[in-house]
Amino acid sequence: MSEQEIWEKVLTLAQEKVSSASYQTFLKDTKLFKLQNEQAIVVTDDDFVANWLKMNYAEIIKAALYEAIGHEIAPVFYTEEELKSLHTSEQKEENQPEQPAKKYTPGVDEAVIGGEQFNTHNTFETFVIGPGNRFPHAASLAVAEAPAKAYNPLFIYGGVGLGKTHLMHAIGHYVLDNNPDAKVIYTSSEKFTNEFIKSIRDNKTERFREKYRNIDVLLIDDIQFIQNKEQTQEEFFHTFNELHQANKQIVISSDRPPKEIAKLEDRLRSRFEWGLIVDITPPDYETRMAILQKKIGEENLNIPTEALTYIANQIQSNIRELEGALTRVLAFSKLQGQPITTELTAEALKDIIQAPKSKKITIQDIQKIVGQYYSVRIEDFSAKKRTKSIAYPRQIAMYLSRELTDFSLPKIGEEFGGRDHTTVIHAHEKIVKDIQNDPTFKQEVENLEKEIRNQ
């Protein structure tokens, strides 16, 4: 099947999952540029559409790609201009005088991440500094300017959507911009684990070790996911030691500090504490306004200050939700064919802004509502029972816990009888698929969400 045929199938599948207006506005004119390195490079008309697809339809497109080609592949979104820029850079490299051949290192050269695989937006220049992230930004910049000489390891922790990944990508961009020959790997601990398991299964552990131990900078996201994984922790311990002893930079991110990562080996915990530990906290009002203003400035948009003020006042939890709210308002304005006003902004965000909460949603709240709906006792959510009448409501409760709370995957698993985070991921993926395939079930879940939010 050609790439054009693949994309036609993807669009046909995606069209069934979105409204006609959304399809015409955001999906109809997209193209599949190519499949490369487990990524589907999708071309869009402009930054606005690219951002909207990334924020709202990435999972739908990912599922459609899986159905079209038979294996998982992640969509990434570029504008025509960005692709031309990348192509120009590649041509410049091709026109450089031929250099002596570098020594090939098995498992490294084909796996080392180049700058084009980092998010092009996530640089130090685009990072908005405020009281909650000033120290992490300064530490990250120091590490990028002098790898392994400033803070090693650098451990960044904080809640979802606060800028940890942005800083890690920024470090990668900076290092490669100043030393194109540097070997930089950015990965998540989950991917590290999966690669390690595959290397054992395929009898290629030495190749895996060459990949991760013969580099200059290792950027590893969401390290908390290696808790409970003894073999992965053992492997990462030795990888950490080899890199550190070779004076190579290690940057780690997590949703909590090392001391709060349960079931993490003490020897790893102590190594994470060798360098500098910094935390990112939610942005204050001034920082939220600065983020919104920078965003509209980058995209050359004209939005009234009153509308931005409304967004900044209503969305306070994290940057990802803040930018998502702005994207939602822009899309709503475009679909309605109306200029952005405070009233239109409020209308666009009414479904994601709840009335002032009397209390924060807890996993216990979710278990209570789901239990009442499906006649399941709260204690059964934590039990080992696997009968469908209990197992399926448990999966729904796990899905809602991930959607409606900021708790980490391990924490959610812990609240459901100490289950592994992969069980939570599986439950979430199953319910997402069932929602997509069954309109009646989708309405059922939406009703549960409303009841939980309004309790």
Swiss-Prot record:
Main location: cytoplasm
NCBIfam families named in the record: DnaA, PRK14086.1
Organism: Staphylococcus saprophyticus subsp. saprophyticus (strain ATCC 15305 / DSM 20229 / NCIMB 8711 / NCTC 7292 / S-41)
A family per Pfam: DnaA_N
HAMAP family (UniProt xref): DnaA_bact
Domain of life according to the entry: Bacteria
Annotated segments matching region Disordered: 85-104
Its biological purpose: Plays an essential role in the initiation and regulation of chromosomal replication. ATP-DnaA binds to the origin of replication (oriC) to initiate formation of the DNA replication initiation complex once per cell cycle. Binds the DnaA box (a 9 base pair repeat at the origin) and separates the double-stranded (ds)DNA. Forms a right-handed helical filament on oriC DNA; dsDNA binds to the exterior of the filament while single-stranded (ss)DNA is stabiized in the filament's interior.
GO molecular function: ATP binding; ATP hydrolysis activity; DNA replication origin binding; lipid binding
Positions of transmembrane segments: none
Statement: the UniProt record of this protein carries the keyword Coiled coil: no
GO CC annotation: cytoplasm; plasma membrane
Domain I, interacts with DnaA modulators: region residues: 1-74
Assigned protein family: Belongs to the DnaA family.
Subunit structure comment from the entry: Oligomerizes as a right-handed, spiral filament on DNA at oriC.
Record's keyword annotation contains ATP-binding: yes
UniProt: ATP binding residues: G161, G163, K164, T165
Protein name: Chromosomal replication initiator protein DnaA
Region called Domain II, residue ranges: 74-116
UniProt xrefs under CDD domains: AAA, Bac_DnaA_C
GO biological process, alphabetically ordered: DNA replication initiation; regulation of DNA replication
